[in-house]
């Protein structure tokens, strides 16, 4: 029962869409109604409100981090195996993609995935963050940066953590992230993908 409660709690935490929450609090339009239609920091940035985008980014990353850290602490307290931590990581990520509180219209998961990876292993998170930043600085395209990072994240996980359940979890998260970017892939191929910071 405790396993189910932790997984459900992680999913509900992941379902907090900070793009929508922050936008409402700051009197901005719903990020699902303009730009890419994605409730994420990049789309919030298209309003020109950098503070809102930063708060969205931090909130989405923090919930992924908290889900893993809290699950790890409770697992130790109740003598649960480490698999529950990985299940909670996946549950939080899926919650972000399909949030029950917002009609299952979630984001693409980049910030939440980063928070999860940092919690699983700081070096893994740092490697992925460095990859995203490097790609963003060179190409100025958020989706391309995310896709390249998603492809490399399981490789980083295997090298840093070993080819184990943790690496498999990272692979699943990466595959889900790529799936959520399927529309962006077409835009990248046709040269229609928007650049970071472009106003809607």
Swiss-Prot record:
Domain of life where this protein originates: Bacteria
Keyword list, A-Z: Cell inner membrane, Cell membrane, Lipid biosynthesis, Lipid metabolism, Membrane, Phospholipid biosynthesis, Phospholipid metabolism, Transferase, Transmembrane, Transmembrane helix
Annotated GO CC locations: plasma membrane
GO molecular-function terms, A-Z: acyl-phosphate glycerol-3-phosphate acyltransferase activity
InterPro entries: G3P_acylTferase_PlsY (IPR003811)
Pfam families in the record: G3P_acyltransf
Subcellular location: Cell inner membrane
Top-level EC class as recorded in UniProt: transferase
GO BP terms, alphabetized: phospholipid biosynthetic process
Role, per record: Catalyzes the transfer of an acyl group from acyl-phosphate (acyl-PO(4)) to glycerol-3-phosphate (G3P) to form lysophosphatidic acid (LPA). This enzyme utilizes acyl-phosphate as fatty acyl donor, but not acyl-CoA or acyl-ACP.
NCBIfam families reported in the protein's UniProt record: glycerol-3-phosphate 1-O-acyltransferase PlsY (TIGR00023)
Protein family membership: Belongs to the PlsY family.
The protein's name: Glycerol-3-phosphate acyltransferase
Source species: Thiobacillus denitrificans (strain ATCC 25259 / T1)
Phylogenetic placement of the source organism: Bacteria, Pseudomonadati, Pseudomonadota, Betaproteobacteria, Nitrosomonadales
């Amino acid at each position: 029962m405790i396993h189910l409660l932790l997984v459900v709690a992680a999913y509900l935490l992941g379902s907090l869409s900070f793009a929508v929450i922050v936008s409402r609090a700051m009197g901005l339009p719903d990020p699902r109604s303009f730009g890419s239609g994605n409730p994420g920091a990049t789309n919030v940035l298209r309003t020109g409100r950098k503070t809102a985008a930063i708060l969205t980014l931090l909130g989405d990353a923090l919930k992924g981090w908290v889900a893993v850290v809290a699950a790890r602490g409770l697992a130790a307290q109740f003598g649960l195996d480490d698999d529950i931590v990985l299940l909670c990581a996946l549950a939080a990520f899926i919650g972000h993609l399909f949030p029950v509180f917002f009609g299952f219209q979630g984001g693409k998961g980049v910030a939440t995935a980063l928070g999860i990876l940092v919690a699983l292993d700081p070096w893994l998170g740092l490697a992925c963050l460095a990859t995203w930043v490097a790609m963003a600085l060179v190409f100025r395209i958020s989706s391309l940066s995310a896709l390249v990072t998603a492809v490399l994240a399981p490789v980083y996980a295997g090298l840093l953590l070993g080819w184990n359940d943790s690496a498999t979890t990272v692979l699943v998260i990466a595959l889900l992230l790529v799936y959520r970017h399927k529309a962006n892939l077409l835009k990248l191929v046709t040269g229609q993908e928007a650049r970071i910071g472009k106003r809607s």
